Amino acid sequence: GAQANQKYALVIGGNAIVVSAEIREGISTAWNLHEMGYPVFVLRYRIGMKASNNAPLQDVVRAVQYITEHAGQFGVQVEDYAIVSYSSGGQIAGLFGTDAVGYKNYGLPKPGAMLLGYPVNTFLEFKPVYNILLDPGVCKQRYYKMTLSDYITPDYPPTYHWYGKNDMTLMTMCWSAQ
């Protein structure tokens, strides 16, 4: 049976604006972690036209809040959890791990580990398009306007980051900025 008070993982797949990778990246990763004995949760966050007003980042916050509030029911620790994320999901997870806009701002425990698979560091050339489509007329800070590496501090959670040298998607998104 399941043990109580285990470390858990929250898995966040990427997306291609209107298509989610929650099955390919999220569920498949979750299954492998589950097979290794880890309690695991997969986040389905808002994408496409539903991603305005920092919705994807807020979805990460709400997921960690929910898991934290129900830790006893799930048999998990509230501290030292891991976030495993991919692509654009890696960008919002990465921002959640920061002091500036992440967990601290919501009174949540700091992630114990960040596993960022080919995360988007910046939406550079897409920023104006995202702003027009998602938040027209809004000049406030939005996740898609943030360059993740600008928010990394010495207190950032321990991180394992990987990407493929021949990743054509990141190459089309201004490779040198990723």
What are these regions (language model features)?
Residues A21-G26, F41-V78:
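Catalytic nucleophile-loop/oxyanion-hole region of alpha/beta-hydrolase
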Residues Y160-G164:
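Short beta-strand/loop motif that positions the catalytic acidic residue
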Residues P136-Y151, Y156-P157:
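Active-site nucleophile elbow and catalytic-triad environment of alpha/beta-hydrolase enzymes
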Residues M168-W175:
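Conserved alpha/beta-hydrolase "acid-adjacent" motif
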Residues R62-I132, K140-Y143:
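Primarily recognizes the serine-hydrolase "nucleophile elbow" in alpha/beta-hydrolase
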Residues Y8, H34-R44, A82, A113:
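A fold-wide structural signal in alpha/beta-hydrolase
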Residues N5-N15:
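Short beta-strand element of the alpha/beta-hydrolase
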Residues G13-V18, K165:
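Active-site glycine-rich loops that stabilize anionic/oxyanionic intermediates
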